[in-house]
């Protein structure tokens, strides 16, 4: 007949938990974790984990990582990078100074051309612009400013 509870549930509240008196179910006879991989567990490591120990090849000392790191933002998300107040002010006085959106400060490097911009001029600062993004920004009377 199948038991409803697992053995561990039945043993709750019993100090020895089925392992006899003090010290009978010994603590960590082979060491903890991966201990002894080069010594008493050598056979297991050699058989099932070949190449676990040791090094191969040479190190590349001056390797530049993340050279191609270039987070992008699309035009349809451009206005979400500025505050609500800036958006309202820009919509009110269309003849005044165009608002400046610095995408680098928001963590983006490149502006891509997906989506539409509202018909009001805006100055966008970024490290890179796609061709279509530049066309669309200039199409609404804005400007693209390259920053280092």
From Swiss-Prot:
Alphabetized Gene3D superfamilies for the sequence: 3.100.10.10, 4.10.990.10
PTM sites of type (3S)-3-hydroxyhistidine: 39
Keywords: Acetylation, Cytoplasm, Hydroxylation, Phosphoprotein, Ribonucleoprotein, Ribosomal protein
Disulfide bonds: none
Residues where Phosphoserine is found: 68
Compartments, record wording: Cytoplasm
Primary location recorded for the protein, binned into one broad class: cytoplasm
Transmembrane spans: none
Gene Ontology cellular component annotations, sorted alphabetically: cytosolic large ribosomal subunit
Molecular function terms from GO: structural constituent of ribosome
Modified residues (N6-acetyllysine): 47, 55, 110
Post-translational modification: Hydroxylated on His-39 by MINA.
Ranges for region Disordered: 1-39
Highest taxon of the lineage: Eukaryota
GO BP term, example: translation
Compositional bias ranges of the Basic residues kind: 1-30
InterPro entries: Rbsml_uL15_N (IPR027386), Ribosomal_uL15 (IPR030878), Ribosomal_uL15/eL18 (IPR021131), Ribosomal_uL15/eL18_sf (IPR036227), Ribosomal_uL15_CS (IPR001196)
Summary of subunit composition and partner proteins: Component of the large ribosomal subunit.
Family of the protein in this entry: Belongs to the universal ribosomal protein uL15 family.
Protein function: Component of the large ribosomal subunit. The ribosome is a large ribonucleoprotein complex responsible for the synthesis of proteins in the cell.
HAMAP family found in the cross-reference section: Ribosomal_uL15
Protein name: Large ribosomal subunit protein uL15
Organism: Macaca fascicularis (Crab-eating macaque)
Gene name as annotated: RPL27A
């Amino acid at each position: 007949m199948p038991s409803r509870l697992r053995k561990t549930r039945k043993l709750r509240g019993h100090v020895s938990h089925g392992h006899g008196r003090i010290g009978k179910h010994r603590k960590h006879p082979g060491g903890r974790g991966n201990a002894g991989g080069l010594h008493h567990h050598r056979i297991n490591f050699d058989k099932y984990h070949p190449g676990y120990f040791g090094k191969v090849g040479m190190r590349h000392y001056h390797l530049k990582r993340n050279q191609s790191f270039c987070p992008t933002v699309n035009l349809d998300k451009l206005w979400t990078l500025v505050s609500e107040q800036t958006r309202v002010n820009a919509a009110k006085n269309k003849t005044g100074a165009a608002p400046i959106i610095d995408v680098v400060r928001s963590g983006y490097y490149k502006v891509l051309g997906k989506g539409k911009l509202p018909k009001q001029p805006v100055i966008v600062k970024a490290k890179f612009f796609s061709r279509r993004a530049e066309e669309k920004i200039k199409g609404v009377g804005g400007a693209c400013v390259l920053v280092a």
